[in-house]
Amino acid sequence: MVVTNSCAPDPRVLRSAFWLSEAGHQVTVHAFDRLQLHAKSESLHGARIMRYHLGDIPYGGMLKSIRGIMQFSKRVKATLLHSPPELIYCHDADTLSIAVSLKKSHGIPFVFDMHDLHHTWIRMPAPKSILRKLLSRKMESTMIRHAGKADAIITTSGKIEGGIHDGFEQYLQSKNLASIVVENRPIEMSIPQQRNPENKDWTVGYLGRVRELKTFTLMLEAIKLIPTTERPKLIIAGDGIRENEVRELMLNAIESDGIEADVSGAFTPDQFQELVKQLDVMFAIYPPERGNILQGALPVKMFDAAANGVPSVVNSGCLMGEIAEAEEIGKAVAWNDAQAACDALLELRNKTVELTITSQREKEKFLSTVLPLID
């Protein structure tokens, strides 16, 4: 398996590695530790994680990131050539060039797992930038060409039965690429605690990658519409390219508006469990300008929160909102509507939800797709 993050952790990568290991296969995850923060070698969930340290290459720097990924790809390719695997599993589009090259030279089959529309990420810092728009189109074209060479394609979302909103499966279909949907549903479920309707102390959280400032600006706008004595505490946890800006935004809100907030960085799976148990509502509303939200992105935090009984506020007018309301695990509201977000938070504050569709369904689809390529 190849992934361009440090896999410390990456739940989808580790879940797929665990399923293959459980099925009797040896799995090595080749991960790019850009900030060189984690052990170079680690065993986790039955898989070996090899982390490549290639100098400090921070997230967000476009040219540095491109050069770093090219260097990482070259190193991984050399490692795999030294001891060729039976199968290469590509997590996201920025790892495809490795598998395409080795399939051409050594006939090694590969799976493309499209977590997200990777070409939309480059537009995140400046959605109106013409240069970033052109680069995004080039990345998309390359991804489609490489994906066509895959022996199987797996993705994270698809239109639900009787639904109206498309997912990534439909995006791939529009490019004449067939795929299997394996959603990011957690393996472990917690027994949810019933909320106390008389309890005035409550907490709203955001746990995950901190990629966009606008999500947190909207969160604060919604919270400020709640009377001061009834406002929730905020818990923000996660790392990403906007981490420092979000921290500063929250510190200003604490000082100027009396908002109560805890802000922290990256967390482990165990720490996530401790954090999510403190929440009453998960905030998972994203700016739709970059494209992947309206095309079917499903926030992992929505499923992880529901597995712990916590409802989420998510975007309306897209697949995530449709699933949240169909499965009764959250409330969908329009982007940039602070009043609607405020109303949804208040509506959900004492609600306990249950995630009835778990990863078992996803595991069966995953194994039926991947195992025929190696067994």
Each language-model region and where it sits:
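Conserved donor-binding/catalytic core segment of Leloir-type glycosyltransferases
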Residues: I154, P186-E188, N196-K224, I235
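N-terminal subdomain of nucleotide-sugar transferases
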Residues: M1-L37, E42, A152, G158, ...
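A short, active-site helix/loop in glycosyltransferases that binds the activated sugar's phosphate group
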Residues: R137-S179, P186-E188
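Nucleotide-activated donor-binding/catalytic signature segment of Leloir-type glycosyltransferases, i.e.
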Residues: R247-V276, V281
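Short hydrophobic beta-strand element within catalytic cores of glycosyltransferases
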Residues: V281-A284, D304-V314
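Conserved acidic donor-binding segment of nucleotide-sugar-dependent glycosyltransferases
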Residues: A326-E327, K331-A338, L346-R349
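Membrane-proximal helix-turn-helix segments that form the acceptor-binding/catalytic region
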Residues: K74-L81, S97, S101-S105, H118-H119, ...
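A charged, aromatic-enriched C-terminal amphipathic alpha-helix characteristic of glycosyltransferases
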Residues: N336-A340, R349-D375
